[in-house]
Amino acid sequence: RRTKLLMIEKTKQKKLLIEVLNGDKHDQIPIWLMRQAGRHLPEYKKLRLESENFLDFCYSPKLSVEATIQPIRRYNLDAAILFSDILVIPDALGQQVEFVPGKGPILKPITNVSSIKKLNQRKVLQYLSPIYQAIEKIIDQLKMFSFNPSLIGFAGAPWTVATYMVEGGSSKDYHTTRKWAYESPHEFSQLIDLLVDVTSQHLIQQID
């Protein structure tokens, strides 16, 4: 999955990753991994048992904070990545999203402009507020590490999220999405434009 990354910094402490990104020279190379949190960690597998529903897990500040911090605690990485999922956006928009064990995410497909218009973006930030609460707690916990790790925000790229919303889940060839985009670009762009707007708001709120 392609993701948009942003740095969430609310402290004046020097952070290796931020300084290197700003062009400063260091003998040490900052390290973070795209999938540094999650199922490869035994402590995550134990933590995951505390919530039957994966989206509920993502919306729980307590659980998402711990999932974010676990790889920092284990590997001393230079940045934590906000533990979340790209499908919180369609879920917040009102699309039916379910994570089925053994199958992955299943969504009620968006098939036309009428389906797009049923999506409600007015309360997205309110719906996602537990994620922003988690960010505040993550920042506080990261201060406990002497090497001052940064925090990288998280959201799915609009095209990637759109493919899940249109296909109703993962796909090998994304035929339905590509067909709609090529045959009715003005219709499909309404979904992309909506996702660009909502995702931008979500990322800005992560910084604020």
Predicted feature residues:
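Short, Lys/Arg-enriched N-terminal segments with co-localized hydrophobic residues
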Residues: 1-6
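N-terminal basic, low-complexity leaders that serve as flexible interaction/assembly modules and, when applicable
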Residues: 7-92, 144
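Conserved, mostly hydrophobic/aromatic
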Residues: 30, 72, 138, 199, ...
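Gly/Ser/Thr-rich helix-start
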Residues: 39, 95, 157
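Short beta-strand segments at enzyme active-site cores
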Residues: 80-83, 151-154, 207-208
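Pocket-flanking alpha-helical
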Residues: 91-94, 138
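Active-site-proximal, glycine-rich beta->alpha crossover segments in alpha/beta enzymes
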Residues: 98-202
